A protein has these predicted regions:
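Basic, Gly/Ser/Thr-rich N-terminal segments that form RNA-phosphate-binding interfaces in CRISPR RAMP
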Residues: 69-70, 150-151, 180, 194
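Short, glycine-/Ser/Thr-/acidic-enriched flexible segments
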Residues: 140
Length: 196
């Protein structure tokens, strides 16, 4: 276990340079945040926020780096017609409910089957507002989240208008889609960030 923790720390230090890191939150403040939200963050993200950085200026996602714990990007509460094909999926100004389970277990492309607002609006709201912390945004309307509650706990998910998908090719291999692998793939230019 100590070797895995040391390897995770080394990779996160190498991937995210000191000059790009915000001050770490510290263990006491992190535990207080977790108590106030009734969740325990998954490792190694938990250790990263407490000991290495509570947000970064560069890194995944590509626009602005990692958000500080609990923060939302500016575009979270702004609806621009060119970024959103679906009806407004959630109240972006409302509080996020982290202790309720993230509702999805596999990719969902609602842009193809959003024919019933009454049927889909509750699930869409939960997808954006329940059980995950926001990691950042690639651009307005595209967000990376880390699931903190429910069966997908520990997995990174990509949310965009019309689709929500887990990071990694195989849902049966959760470690490939966790925070550490997501950062590593960005750092070495593979997976999502592979040059086209």
């Amino acid at each position: 276990v100590k070797d895995a923790i040391s390897e995770a720390k080394a990779l996160l230090h190498a991937a995210l340079p000191v000059g790009s890191r915000h001050a770490p939150l510290g263990w006491e403040a992190l535990r207080a945040w977790e108590r106030s939200h009734a969740v325990v963050l998954p490792e190694p993200y938990r250790m990263f926020v407490a000991e290495i950085a509570n947000g970064t200026d560069i890194g995944p996602p590509d626009e602005g780096g990692l958000l500080p714990l609990g923060e939302k990007p500016q575009s979270w509460a702004v609806w621009e017609a060119d970024c959103w094909m679906s009806p407004e999926p959630f109240d972006g100004t409302g509080a996020r409910t982290l202790d309720r389970p993230f509702p999805l277990e596999e990719e969902w492309q609602w842009e193809y089957d959003y024919y019933d607002h009454g049927l889909h609006s509750s699930l869409l709201h939960k997808t954006y507002q329940h059980g995950s912390v926001l990691l950042g945004t690639d651009r307005p309307g595209e967000y990376w989240t880390l699931v903190v509650t429910g069966p997908q706990r520990g997995r990174v998910w990509w949310l965009r208008d019309g689709c929500a998908a887990p990071y990694a090719d195989s849902p049966s291999d959760p470690p490939a889609g966790d925070f550490l692998h997501w950062v590593r793939d960005w750092h070495v230019g593979q997976g999502w960030w592979r040059a086209g």
